[in-house]
Design a protein with these regions (language model features):
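Flexible glycine/acidic-rich beta-alpha junction loops that bind and position SAM and/or redox cofactors
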Residues: 29-35, 120, 192, 247, ...
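Radical SAM enzyme core and accessory elements
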Residues: 2-29, 58-64, 124, 143, ...
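Residue-level recognition of beta-strand->loop/alpha-helix junctions
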Residues: 64-68, 84, 267, 292, ...
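Structural recognition of alpha->loop->beta junctions
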Residues: 120-139, 280-290, 346-361
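Acidic, low-complexity intrinsically disordered segments
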Residues: 21-228
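Radical SAM [4Fe-4S] cluster-binding motif and immediate context
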Residues: 166-329, 336, 342-345, 349
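Structural detector of well-ordered beta-strand residues that form the stable sheet scaffold
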Residues: 108-109, 129, 153, 264-266, ...
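Conserved beta-strand positions
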Residues: 26, 83, 130, 237-239, ...
Length: 467
């Protein structure tokens, strides 16, 4: 395998066992068309590849390239390349895989998209990890060393336990130009199975919890970010619902109080019903929560399976969180079957009246593996099969109550009006939340919104012959 002291990356048995450490390159591709959030959003560190790196045995030399913050050299050598990508970045992922395979380098792909579209992915890679990497990654690496790599690795029946979870090695991200946020995971799974969301299909319909002791040890090992940052110890809990298990949440929040963190996460509207958890959020340093309001229409909420959301209570939910000093990032989706052209102005009016700290608007996007994707495919409503457009900024389907062009125009209108200077100050004034966090976030989004609208592409939305 070695010639003149260099690894021969063109040999036929690239993954046979070697005495020396083998070189593993992990890649996170950049989507050709950005999500809303632009540079601000994309400079957040990606936890997925750090977790894969932590599962890799020490006899592999691991490096990570994240195209959000650095360039990938497609001519570099490696014994194995691992690539993970969300749907809008998967075309770029396939380009990268094709390039490395053309030089005889084995490629393994993972992530939500290829887990739902493995046959598509296998046209570009040697192997696909379906589902979560735990208990599968080490098998794939061992098979790779024996040159016996299988095309598919999947869990048999149950999802892996989150106990004995290896902590991510944040040293692999040192020197990279990320925003100063540490990502932590404490739970996986969701029982709600909303029609547009792929979490339940990917991670199961039950909540699985990491032992709080392990989460606390990971927090103890975090190092404050260096540099001229106002907040140096910010944590984002990536759990889809931080209050998924009330007992686990209470123990976790109680344990992290002494660490003087500032943290954010995601929660359902039901958090407003639990004063004890809200008080623990406040004491443990919660700056804000992403709350999935999704829609102002009860009909839409019923269709998507989110019946515990009731629009009549939304303003009270926001006020309750503000009473505890917790900011609210309100997530709304446009394009559901009960949405007509009035939805945009109604939502603009609501977010200002409710004093939502940050608005996160998106266009309904039927991702593979979701119920809405299967339904729209069956109904012939999908009009765009270019995965790079599946980024929540484009319309890839035929809405029921408006034309695709009107959905896109209304989306841009809602963004522009909600992130005007006047709207920002109306939303944030008097909230009692972390201004040195939410004002910069709003101005960052405002800049991205202006860029998004300025570079707006005009689509004809002709019928897709493949739909």
């Amino acid at each position: 395998m070695k010639q003149n002291g260099k690894i021969n990356i063109h040999g036929p048995n690239l993954c046979q066992k070697m005495e020396d450490n083998m070189k593993l390159l992990l890649v996170s591709p950049l989507a050709s068309k950005s999500f809303l959030g632009g540079d601000f959003y994309f400079r957040l560190p990606y936890l997925g590849l750090l977790k894969v790196a932590s599962l890799t045995p020490p006899n592999w030399d691991v490096s990570i390239i994240d195209e959000k913050v650095e360039s990938l050299d497609l001519t570099q050598g490696a014994d194995l390349v691992g690539i993970t990508a969300m749907t809008p970045a998967v075309n770029r992922a396939y380009e990268i895989a094709d390039s490395f395979r053309s030089r005889g380098i084995k490629v393994i792909m993972g992530g939500m998209h290829v887990s739902k579209m493995p046959d598509e992915a296998l046209r570009h890679c040697d192997s696909v990890i379906i589902g979560e990497a735990e208990r599968l990654w080490d098998k794939a690496l061992n098979d790779c060393k024996r040159d016996e790599l299988k095309s598919i690795y999947r869990h048999d029946n149950e999802y892996p336990s989150l106990a004995n979870f290896p902590a991510p090695n944040w040293k692999l991200y040192e020197g990279k130009r990320y925003l100063p946020v540490h990502f932590l995971e404490t739970t996986r799974g969701c029982p709600h199975n909303c029609e547009f969301c792929s979490v339940t299909n990917s991670f199961g319909g039950k909540f699985r919890n990491r032992p709080v002791d392990e989460v606390e040890r990971e927090i103890q090992d975090l190092k404050p970010f260096e540099g001229r940052f106002v907040l140096k110890n910010v944590v984002f809990f990536v759990d889809d619902n931080i209050i998924s298990n009330r007992k686990h949440t209470k123990e976790l929040l109680s344990r992290i109080i002494p660490y003087n963190l500032k943290w954010t996460g995601q929660a359902s509207v039901n958090i407003a019903k639990n004063n004890e958890i809200l008080e623990l959020c406040k004491k443990s340093g919660c700056m804000g929560l992403v709350v999935g309001f999704e829609s102002l229409s009860q009909g839409n909420l019923a269709n998507m399976g989110k019946t515990f959301n009731t629009p009549d209570t939304y303003i009270d939910v926001v006020k309750k969180l503000h009473d505890y000093g917790i900011g609210v990032t309100g997530a709304f989706v446009f394009g559901f079957d009960h949405d007509d052209e009035s939805v945009f102005d109604r939502t603009i009016e609501f977010v200002i009246k409710a004093k939502i700290d940050v608005c996160y608007f998106s266009i309904l996007t039927p991702y593979p593996g979701t119920r809405v994707y299967s339904q729209m495919l069956q109904e012939g409503r999908i009009i765009d099969h270019d995965w790079s457009n599946y980024n929540t900024n484009h319309v890839v389907f035929k809405p029921k109550l408006m034309k695709p062009e009107k959905l896109l125009d209304g989306f841009h209108h809602a963004l522009k009006e909600s992130f005007s200077y006047t709207a920002i100050f109306k939303r944030l004034w008097g909230n009692g939340t972390y201004k040195n966090f939410f004002y910069p976030m709003n101005f960052g989004f405002r800049q991205t919104v202006r860029k998004t609208i300025k570079n707006k592409q005009h689509f004809s939305y002709e019928e897709d012959p493949d739909s």
